[in-house]
Amino acid sequence: MAAEQDPEGRAAARPLLTDLYQATMALGYWRAGRAQDQAEFELFFRQCPFGGAFALAAGLRDCVRFLRAFRLRDADVQFLASALPPDTDPAFFEHLRALDCSGVTVRALPEGSLAFPGVPLLQVSGPLLVVQLLETPLLCLVSYASLIATNAARLRLIAGPDKRLLEMGLRRAQGPDGGLTASTYSYLGGFDASSNVLAGQLRGVPVAGTLAHSFVTSFSGSEVPPDPMLAPAAGQGSQVDLAASVEMWLERVCGHLGLGVQEPHRGERAAFVAYALAFPRAFQGLLDTYSVRRSGLPNFLAVALALQELGYQAVGVRLDSGDLLQQAREIRGVFRTAAAQFGVPWLQSVPIAVSNNIDEEELARLAQKGSEVNVIGIGTSVVTCPRQPSLGCVYKLVSVGGQPRMKLTEDPEKQTLPGSKAAFRLLGSDGSLLLDVLQLAEEPPPQAGQELRVWPRGARESRTVRPAHVEPLLRLWVQQGQLCEPLPSLAESRAFAQQSLHRLSPAHRRLEQPALYQVALSEKLQALVDRLSARGAL
């Protein structure tokens, strides 16, 4: 198995959740006497996902948990011994048994940070053999989490701040751990809640859900509730037979809607009554099992008005098929006339929830001005990221023994930036984001108000910039295996992500054909790149 339960109960990465060549390289390092050489790797992506201009950094908490628990068990070492050549020196396996991350240091963007191509999400330094073994698990933990968070952020930007977004993609996710990761990081990216109960238990994600069509169709209308009596919400007064009250209200509702009392489906009405008896303070009707206009809507109104007499207020309706936008408008119109007809003002503002394979295009339609939709449930489109299934993060060596290392290639996009680095975000006087700058770690940081010459990546010429504010991007989270500061909670990271997105200019937030955000190199870093490139590098 590739996963075990961590203290939170979540499926956690284990050391052998890796590619075999990490183990073969580890043997090579050990055999060459280089296992303890101090090395630094950077984890980053080369292009923003989904054709956009930004990404959100995520997965740090999972990485820290993995590093702190990193240890090869006897069974792990025995398996590696079976996978490596039979004449491998047994001393190598004893070395593996003693490995941990006590010598590892991690700097990273806080979760929820805006991230741009080439800027490290993580910097990982420590003994060469160990930090090499960390490559695949860290990529696995960061790439999907960041992709999901970014996808969720895009959907939130489309929906706007007022629509309630529910993630309901567990049944469509790529396996149990993929489902849990998607629920966790869609919440970080801006969704309000998830249908995933385990995400609520383990990660503190707010959970939401009501009923499915199977609940409605399981009732025929001949069922007699074992106890149809319901007490008033205030707790005082006589109990009322809710089923009988609903039948009385149905006549009035059908008269208002111009329907015969036989038209609404009896089984659907029985299902609504059963659900209302179980959840009188949280009754929601699923309207489209049979006919929204002739059945679901009148049955819902009859139950909602019967509950109203007892002091309860229905919390909403849901649609799962058809033209969601048009149906929502029609339903809102009925709610308004019914509110006036029956003297129940709150009825006109009952929340309308929709779901049904909603993607970015349909979401934009549902979020347009004049839409009567209040709550939107999204499954497949958030958890599977159909527009781009992978962020394409990489983990590249940048220094060994304090000496810079650089990968040269005929593809300029795949060249790496050498040396241990610092990253800064430069801002204008109004707080607007100007650019991110990468520089060598030994360089003094940029100063607010001082002119700085930088080399934008991909440009042939340098430019000067005078920032009004300078923000360091990479924070020290783990030093020599020890946590340096408490990690923010998921809710705190979610709030930080929304703050980060609001700082982006509209041109950079634009989801189609956005203006690209600039990442630049300091003069000293650019000179190092040029020097290593000219001499063939390593």
From Swiss-Prot:
Enzyme class: ligase
Reactions it catalyzes: nicotinate + 5-phospho-alpha-D-ribose 1-diphosphate + ATP + H2O = nicotinate beta-D-ribonucleotide + ADP + phosphate + diphosphate
GO BP of this protein: NAD biosynthetic process via the salvage pathway
Modified residues (Phosphohistidine): 213
Coiled-coil region(s): none
CDD domains, per database record: NAPRTase_A (cd01570)
Source organism superkingdom: Eukaryota
Record's cofactor remark: Activity is highest with Mn(2+).
Record-linked Pfam families: NAPRTase_C, NAPRTase_N
GO molecular function: metal ion binding; nicotinate phosphoribosyltransferase activity; transferase activity
Pathway noted in the entry: Cofactor biosynthesis; NAD(+) biosynthesis; nicotinate D-ribonucleotide from nicotinate: step 1/1
Transmembrane domains' residue ranges: none
Annotated localization: Cytoplasm, Cytosol
UniProtKB keywords: Cytoplasm, Ligase, Magnesium, Manganese, Metal-binding, Phosphoprotein, Pyridine nucleotide biosynthesis, Transferase
EC numbers, comma separated: 6.3.4.21
UniProt PTM: Transiently phosphorylated on a His residue during the reaction cycle. Phosphorylation strongly increases the affinity for substrates and increases the rate of nicotinate D-ribonucleotide production. Dephosphorylation regenerates the low-affinity form of the enzyme, leading to product release.
Alphabetized InterPro entries for the sequence: Aldolase_TIM, NAPRTase_C, NAPRTase_N, Nic_PRibTrfase-Fam, Nic_PRibTrfase_pncB, Nicotinate_pribotase-like_C
Similarity-based family: Belongs to the NAPRTase family.
Record note on quaternary structure: Homodimer.
Protein name as catalogued: Nicotinate phosphoribosyltransferase
Source organism of this protein record: Bos taurus (Bovine)
Gene giving rise to this polypeptide: NAPRT
